[in-house]
Amino acid sequence: MNSRPLLVTCGLPYTNGPCHLGHLRTYVPADFYVRFMRRKGEEVVFICGSDNHGTPIVVSAEKEGTTPRQISERYHTHFSDTFTKMQVHFDHFGMTDDPTTHARTKHLVSRLIDRGYVYPKVIQQAYCIHCQKFLPDRYLEGICPHCKKPARGDECDQGCGKHLEPGEILEPTCKICGNRAEYREQEHFFFKLSGFQDWLREYLGELKGTDNAINYALGWVNEDLHDWCITRTLEWGVKFPGHDDLVVYVWVDAPIGYIGFTEEWAEKTGRDWKTYWCGENTRVTHFIGQDITYHHCVFWPAMLHGAGYGTPYAVVASGMLKIDDHKFSKSRGYVVWTNEDYLDQGLPADYLRYYLLSYTSHTKEMNFSWQLFQERINNEVVNNLGNFIYRSLHLSQKQFGGVPEGVVEQEIFDRITEAIGQVTGLVEAYDFKGAVDAILALSAWGNTYIQSKEPWKLAKTDQAAMAQVMRNCLQLAKALTLLIEPVMPERAGLIWSQLGQDSLIANNGFSAGLEPLSPGPLPAPSIVFSKIDDKMTQELDKRLRDRIDALDAEKKPKTPEISIEEFAKVEMKTGKILSAEQVPKSTKLLKLQVSIGDEVRQIVSGIAQFHNPEELVGKDVVVCTNLKPAKIFGIESNGMILAAGDNASLLRPETPVPSGTKIR
């Protein structure tokens, strides 16, 4: 066991919208890791909070006619409540807009200034003449200078993903009014990131965590690092020391929130926050989405090192999320909202936790679909784990009233010991899928064991042999319950009670899985894992499809409306086709002679692929008669035959009417 204090953090949820599955890809694995490390005896502090500053929140507040603080408080409460429902339990969940983080930010930035790592510089800043204001970050959109894709003011979100400094974006456009912005000079402050290049290269060589985070950061550090503008022209945020007209950039105060939240936790628990953030023996592990790797592996450690703080021990970055094999997109409807689409539908938090941890490697892109979700839960959780645990409890309770007398065989203890060691090694290597697979492998072995021993037959022939089998199975069930608790804590707690355990399962280490159950009665077991039926899956999938279709329909260009007076200008009459022939050298056009009562019109129509000329003669049609004459393939056309659909179905009167009758 490592004696260095362990502090685990999660990337801060931004208080500008509700929780979705993309968020949980970070928070559930972090909670799993914390629970697991505590089960193996480590003392762990689990810290997080909400990110409250930056232009998107200001823009949203302006649209709603409220304040950034009110929006932040609303979504802070939302995330806190959602995490509780998802069994993600932080020791402290703070707000970056609270006084502690404001004070810690000013202190850390002041130390960087005092040590010569921050300097002023006049730069080109986007300015909207119409709105008469400078446009930081998300107030601005334009074209990425690197990949030429559409981009936000501070990030190329639709292309290369690079961070953009003020003044870099091409074709700057104000998001408030939509007018083109211009660049004007303004003084801002820069952090000397370029001065940390050699140190960062050495630091990243020692950083623990996942390879996707470390390798991505090394790719940046091995290029030329540019100094980083750390101020913005905003009223909302942490004031830059000595300049009340500027605030620090949100990616400065957001990670400093980790320290501020630790201070708040330490104050209420009587601990010393410096134990976790100062000195060389700190062990801070950040769980993040891979889209914010640059900030956590380059900007953040350089700031900490420059200010004299300890640096992160490990960075664990999750892969991105796809919905139904489509890129995650809120604007296109490819999103699953944690509350609205999942928890509010009565689905267990534990099932979603299992899927997020077991579907694929933590660092790889994850695909979510309701069909896949149903298959994984029913086949792996219910048919494997649930089946073994319920059969073990049911047969033991039915035949012996509980745990039978006897001694667990050594083979069972060996299997449990091996599984605990294997799972522990995988978790410590941040291979969460591998760890869950190893737990399910022990359960699968248990199913094979009970099937091969056939205790239901032994009940009639050899009670002592059956007692031995069930004693072994119950010990496996106990160990499995302890191992699966970090994955599915709520269900594990229910099984723990059915195993006759009075203690909280969270207060037991994995070694308890090797402690024999006391012989004696057990309560009648109940089914803990239920299958997800086809009807529910279809309903959930329909919700997703309806959202996608609705948003897609909104984006389709609408046909411009016209007035009744404009429509009245269009003259349409019934007609009868007198002759029809193919236009030479054309596969699509027919030349028609059409009677419209008092005259015969020559009309060229693109219906040749769907109608034989000889079959058209004598047919009634509807003709637009007041179109200007046009030449098509060199032939004059005086009107238009009306047809519908891809097969050019001809429109005709319901009952015969004289040619030349007006359509009204």
Swiss-Prot record:
- State the Gene3D superfamilies in the record: HUPs, Isoleucyl-tRNA Synthetase, Domain 1, Methionyl-tRNA synthetase, Zn-domain, Nucleic acid-binding proteins
Q: Which note does the record give on the cofactor?
A: Binds 1 zinc ion per subunit.
Q: Return the similarity comment.
A: Belongs to the class-I aminoacyl-tRNA synthetase family. MetG type 1 subfamily.
Species name for this entry?
Answer: Methanospirillum hungatei JF-1 (strain ATCC 27890 / DSM 864 / NBRC 100397 / JF-1)
Which PROSITE patterns does the UniProt entry name for this protein? TRBD (PS50886)
**Co-factor requirement:** Zn(2+)
UniProt binding sites for Zn(2+): C144, C147, C156, C160
Q: Which reaction does it catalyse?
A: tRNA(Met) + L-methionine + ATP = L-methionyl-tRNA(Met) + AMP + diphosphate
Provide a GO CC annotation, any one.
aminoacyl-tRNA synthetase multienzyme complex
- Provide this UniProt record's keywords sorted from A to Z: Aminoacyl-tRNA synthetase, ATP-binding, Cytoplasm, Ligase, Metal-binding, Nucleotide-binding, Protein biosynthesis, RNA-binding, tRNA-binding, Zinc
- Encoded by which gene? metG
Query: What's the EC number here?
Result: 6.1.1.10
Motif 'HIGH' region residues? 13-23
> Would you tell me the protein name for this molecule?
Methionine--tRNA ligase
Give the motif span ('KMSKS' region): 327-331
Q: Which residues form a coiled coil?
A: none
For whether the record's keyword set contains Lipoprotein, the answer is no
Q: What range(s) does the tRNA-binding domain occupy?
A: 566-664
**Assembly and oligomerization:** Homodimer.
Supply the InterPro entries for this chain.
Answer: Anticodon_Met, Met-tRNA-synth_bsu_C, Met-tRNA_ligase_1, Met-tRNA_synth, Methionyl/Leucyl_tRNA_Synth, MetRS_core, MetRS_Zn, NA-bd_OB-fold
> Which biological process, per GO, is one annotated for this protein?
methionyl-tRNA aminoacylation
Q: Which residues bind ATP?
A: K330
Describe the function of this protein: Is required not only for elongation of protein synthesis but also for the initiation of all mRNA translation through initiator tRNA(fMet) aminoacylation.
Q: What class of enzyme is it?
A: ligase
